[in-house]
Amino acid sequence: MELLLPHASNSCPLTVLGFLERAASVFGDSPSLLHTTTVHTWSETHSRCLRIASTLSSASLGINRGQVVSVIGPNVPSVYELQFAVPMSGAVLNNINPRLDAHALSVLLRHSESKLVFVDHHSSSLVLEAVSFLPKDERPRLVILNDGNDMPSSSSADMDFLDTYEGFMERGDLRFKWVRPKSEWTPMVLNYTSGTTSSPKGVVHSHRSVFMSTINSLLDWSLPNRPVYLWTLPMFHANGWSYTWATAAVGARNICVTRVDVPTIFNLIDKYQVTHMCAAPMVLNMLTNHPAQKPLQSPVKVMTAGAPPPATVISKAEALGFDVSHGYGMTETGGLVVSCALKPEWDRLEPDERAKQKSRQGIRTAVFAEVDVRDPISGKSVKHDGATVGEIVFRGGSVMLGYYKDPEGTAASMREDGWFYTGDIGVMHPDGYLEVKDRSKDVVICGGENISSTELEAVLYTNPAIKEAAVVAKPDKMWGETPCAFVSLKYHDGSVTEREIREFCKTKLPKYMVPRNVVFLEELPKTSTGKIQKFLLRQMAKSLP
């Protein structure tokens, strides 16, 4: 059998892009995307994506294979279509968080060398400001997204845009043959983790890793044919945990939501008989505590990730009719690679013990290869006793290719021993279930947004009154975590207040990155070598009101 080798007929590059073509054939007349008064079928979505890809590939634009095309917008049909259309043209898809400020946005556009940006009209002034910071020869062209009924008929900024999205699409050829990757290792998407510094973390995923992550999502959640999926999770967050492509594979009805509004969510769930949704723990908390909350007409499966929601939130959500699952993953894995697979015997446990079992992040998903907890120095596995801590490591097909333009960062996390080191701390239980004890020391996950503590610290250090600064995550019932800043001052005369520090940060950071708490200390705790002991600050943050 050693003479049997791979052949062109059995080694086609793996890619999720074919899911859309199949959806058009199998689910052609079924609704694919719904938003306000807009309804598209899968056949229409396929055609629209082909047209967009065709225009992107046209010689007049000059966008070559492997070059970056960015998307800045909320959960609207055009943003969903671009998850397919951009890579179908051979370009690399780059979703960007629209909540970033203009300076942060300009840093990402320059780092990615983006050639064209699709931007929602609500963010048009932001993007124009961001582009103005770039040298003229590095400025990408702009196309404005005009989903919905609130698009202005004209704008003073129209001259700055190449076209509207619909106009751009109409220029395309329906007969266009989408660009199949020559290799499944060809880059497909570029996602930034939390980064607005001069050295942002750009995570590159190949067609292969995206395919593996998407199949993972389908299998782990047992997503059936024709589910009704509510888009409460931003598509710009790791491509919606790969459900942008997974929903096409099963012909889902995608209900688009541009912002988290509890009454609207409950109304949409009832109106469309929603079956599935993903949400940050903060959204679950909002749904269970809002005056508009009401029992569901039929069960809704909810996938949440990040810090596990408190048992009280899970019980409240399940009382309303939500079937909650949670897991763990990173931008670097393209979605969830660990999930809390429930065991039947847990139902026989006392409520408190059952909640304890369910609060663990869980076990590797079916398609992922290996998850372990290892000593970061020796590289050896720690005891699987639920008590010995170590660094969480991954190995599997959905792990990224690496960090864009950052070989040192790539080598530091993807090491020669064959593991990807997450930077997160956890324990492994005897039954093989992982429990995260501490997220990466440099990341605060606030309402689903990744906030880099090092970036926030860099801003704090620009304040002339601050001598030392450290930012950690403070647990929060609503947001999951909020940034908490510990600072020591150059002068202890009481002239600097918490409010002044917060106002200072507001002038330099997006609103969501501003620390909710500022704690003044005479000196920050340090090791004998002078390193700030953040674990002590985290303990202090937990005790704050």
Curated annotation (Swiss-Prot):
The EC code for this enzyme is 6.2.1.-
PROSITE patterns, sorted: AMP_BINDING
CDD domains registered for this protein in UniProt: ttLC_FACS_AEE21_like
**Keyword Ligase annotated:** yes
Could you say which enzyme class this protein belongs to?
ligase
Query: In the record, what terms sit under GO molecular function?
Result: ligase activity
S-S bridge residues: none
Give the GO biological process terms.
fatty acid metabolic process
The reply to whether Methyltransferase figures as a keyword in the UniProt entry is: no
List the keywords (alphabetical): Fatty acid metabolism, Ligase, Lipid metabolism
The tissues where this chain's protein is expressed are given as: Expressed in roots, leaves, stems, flowers and developing seeds.
Gene3D superfamilies recorded for this chain?
3.30.300.30, N-terminal domain of ligase-like
The record's InterPro entries line, in alphabetical order, gives: AMP-bd_C, AMP-bd_C_sf, AMP-binding_CS, AMP-dep_synth/lig_dom, ANL_N_sf
The entry assigns this protein to a family as follows: Belongs to the ATP-dependent AMP-binding enzyme family.
State what this protein does. Answer: May act as an acid--thiol ligase that activates carboxylic acids by forming acyl-CoAs.
Looking up PANTHER family in the UniProt record yields:
ACYL-ACTIVATING ENZYME, ACYL-ACTIVATING ENZYME 4-RELATED
- Protein name per the record: Probable acyl-activating enzyme 4
Q: Which organism is it from?
A: Arabidopsis thaliana (Mouse-ear cress)
